[in-house]
C-alpha cells in the first residue's frame, strides 16, 4: 500500500510539473505579440504579384503569401500557421483584410495575439 501511494504521488507530481510547463509555454511570447504595432500598407505602390512574409516569435511564428492584383489584395494564403491555430479565426481575419483592403482592422476577439501575428506577417510581406 505504501508503494502505491508513492507511485501515485510521483505521477501526480509529474502531471503538475508538465501542467506548469504547458502554462508557461502558452504564455511565452504572448505579451510581446499582443503589443505589436501593425502599420497600414499603401497598396498603390505595389506591383501585381505574390509577396511572401513572415512573423517569428515562438508559437506565434507564421508565414504567408499575399497576392496583389490591380493594387488590391487578391488572396492571402498562410502556409505556416501559428501553433494552436484556430481556422475560424484565421479565415475571419483573412476575410476582414480582403473586405477592407488593408491590415488596419480590429483584431479577432479572444485571439488578439494570434490576429496581430498574422497581420504582422501580411505587413512584412507587403512592406517595400
Spans of model-derived segments:
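Intrinsically disordered terminal and processing segments
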Residues: 1-63, 67-128
Amino acid at each position: 500500500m505504501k508503494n502505491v501511494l508513492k507511485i501515485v504521488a510521483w505521477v501526480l507530481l509529474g502531471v503538475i510539473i508538465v501542467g506548469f510547463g504547458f502554462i508557461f509555454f502558452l504564455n511565452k511570447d504572448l505579451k510581446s505579440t499582443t503589443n505589436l504595432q501593425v502599420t497600414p500598407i499603401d497598396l498603390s505602390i505595389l506591383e501585381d504579384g505574390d509577396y511572401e512574409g513572415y512573423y517569428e516569435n515562438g508559437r506565434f511564428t507564421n508565414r504567408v503569401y499575399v497576392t496583389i492584383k490591380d493594387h488590391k489584395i487578391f488572396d492571402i494564403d498562410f502556409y505556416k500557421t501559428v501553433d494552436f491555430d484556430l481556422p475560424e479565426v484565421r479565415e475571419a481575419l483573412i476575410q476582414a483584410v480582403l473586405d477592407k483592403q488593408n491590415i488596419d482592422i480590429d483584431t479577432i476577439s479572444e485571439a488578439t495575439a494570434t490576429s496581430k501575428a498574422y497581420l504582422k506577417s501580411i505587413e512584412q510581406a507587403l512592406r517595400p
